[in-house]
């Protein structure tokens, strides 16, 4: 019984987090609410970040590039509330009590849904309708980029990552981190499926489908290392047919100084 107890506690806590983080989207309309519930419930990355301790208590200033309707901001706020109320599982690592969130999203419809749904959160999230290739990035401790960097060409990808590195460096946090989920183009079948689903979801959300530029995992890793990151990779497509990989890129200490 003791062997299953931690999982039971964690599952119950995750269900509570899911309800709390998605409830605000009822104010954004039926689509916003159902999309939030499906995304948080079916995409393994959110719970994976939490249970692996990849969002640390030192990560107070968070930048979410390609934030969509701001689901990550709502999750962070719900995590903080659960900890404050003393219902945080002992197997989960603590996170920042009052994270300062900046979300950057190109699509005006998504930003509007985010404003309608989570604009009331405290601290108030900063939600910018802007292009990640040109948006000003504030000094920060943690940058999250999930499944969006492939929408710009290879040169632009590197330019975005250079600016991310510089924003983390300016933040001066020795725990500075980039969480980057990408598709591994060397896994042809999984990558093709993920691209097809990506295009389908983009259409459903009412957006124009753009061309994409992928890289093999080895190239993503080499690029990040050349920019001064220490990189480890984790499969992050459990329960799906995709070839998604999470790259945990910690800024080398001499880069953060």
Language-model segments: which ranges?
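Conserved S-adenosyl-L-methionine
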Residues: 66
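Helix-capping/helix-break motifs at membrane-protein junctions
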Residues: 153-154
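A conserved beta-strand element that flanks and buttresses the S-adenosyl-L-methionine
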Residues: 144
């Amino acid at each position: 019984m003791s062997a299953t107890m931690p999982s039971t506690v964690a599952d119950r806590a995750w269900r509570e987090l899911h309800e709390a983080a998605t409830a605000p989207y009822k104010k954004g309309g039926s689509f916003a609410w159902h999309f939030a519930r499906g995304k948080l419930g079916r995409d393994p990355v959110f719970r994976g970040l939490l249970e692996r301790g990849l969002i640390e208590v030192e990560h107070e200033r968070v930048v979410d590039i390609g934030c969509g309707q701001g689901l990550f901001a709502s999750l962070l706020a719900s995590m903080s509330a659960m900890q404050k109320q003393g219902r945080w599982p002992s197997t989960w690592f603590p996170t920042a009590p009052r994270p300062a969130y900046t979300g950057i999203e190109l699509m005006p419809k998504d930003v509007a849904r985010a404003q309608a749904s989570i604009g009331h959160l405290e601290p108030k999230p900063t939600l910018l309708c802007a292009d990640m290739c040109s948006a000003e990035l504030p000094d920060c401790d943690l940058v999250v980029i999930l499944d969006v960097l492939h929408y710009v060409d290879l040169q632009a990808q590197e330019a975005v990552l250079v600016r991310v590195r510089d924003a983390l460096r300016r933040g001066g946090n020795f725990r500075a981190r980039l969480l980057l989920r990408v598709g591994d183009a060397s896994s042809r079948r999984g990558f093709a499926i993920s691209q097809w689903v990506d295009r389908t979801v983009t259409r459903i959300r009412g957006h124009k489908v753009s061309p994409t530029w992928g890289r093999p995992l080895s190239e993503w890793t080499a690029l990040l290392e050349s920019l001064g990151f220490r990189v480890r990779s984790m499969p992050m497509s459990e329960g799906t047919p995709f070839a998604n990989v999470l790259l945990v890129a910690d800024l080398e200490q001499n880069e953060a100084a």
